[in-house]
């Protein structure tokens, strides 16, 4: 039962959902650190959480096998993930996986003592940007579906 939420936590989440739904005119589902917003047109965006998302735009990129996910923003059009505790060798391995997954068109790379940046696109017109901060061992990943 240690994984169950307390009644007060459930009540607080439900109250927060109602306030946000009324203010924004959207459906809101709060589940601990994760919030899902569904617009009137059915579009969905998920924010928060500390797990790698496996749906919407996140399904278009390889899953990072190391580090600790600290932030997620995921929708059908874009995805941002921040991963901490990523060693440089793990970033380099992930970069190889991303390129092998097809993110190699329109490629631009930059690296200095502070950052390594990789920008590319795949054949589905999905653009990806990786920014690895060497000192903090943090990887910021962003993908967006380009409009046609």
Where are these regions (language model features)?
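C-terminal motif of bacterial Sec signal peptides marking the signal peptidase cleavage site
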Residues: 2-3
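Compositionally biased P/S/T/G-rich terminal and signal peptide-adjacent segments
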Residues: 7-79, 146-148
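A short, sequence-level motif marking secondary-structure junctions
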Residues: 48-54, 99, 131-136
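Short amphipathic beta-strand and strand-loop transition segments with alternating hydrophobic
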Residues: 67-72, 107, 129-132
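Surface-exposed aromatic
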Residues: 76-81, 112-118
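Second-shell loop/turn segments in exported
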Residues: 78-86, 126
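Amphipathic alpha-helical segments
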Residues: 85-106
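Short, exposed beta-strand-loop hairpins at the edges of beta-sheets
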Residues: 117-145
């Amino acid at each position: 039962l240690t994984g169950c939420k307390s009644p007060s936590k459930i009540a607080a989440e439900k109250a927060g959902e109602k306030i946000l739904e009324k203010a924004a005119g959207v459906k809101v589902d709060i589940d601990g650190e994760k919030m899902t917003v569904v617009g009137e047109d059915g579009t969905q965006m998920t924010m928060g959480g500390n797990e790698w998302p496996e749906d919407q735009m996140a399904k278009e990129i390889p899953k990072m096998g190391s580090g600790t996910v600290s932030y997620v923003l995921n929708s059908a059009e874009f995805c941002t993930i921040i991963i901490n505790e990523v060693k440089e060798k793990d970033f380099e391995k992930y970069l190889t996986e991303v390129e092998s997954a097809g993110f190699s068109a329109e490629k631009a790379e930059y690296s200095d003592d502070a950052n390594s940046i990789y920008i590319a696109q795949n054949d589905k017109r999905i653009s990806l940007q990786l920014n690895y901060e060497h000192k903090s061992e943090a990887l910021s990943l962003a993908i967006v579906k380009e409009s046609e």
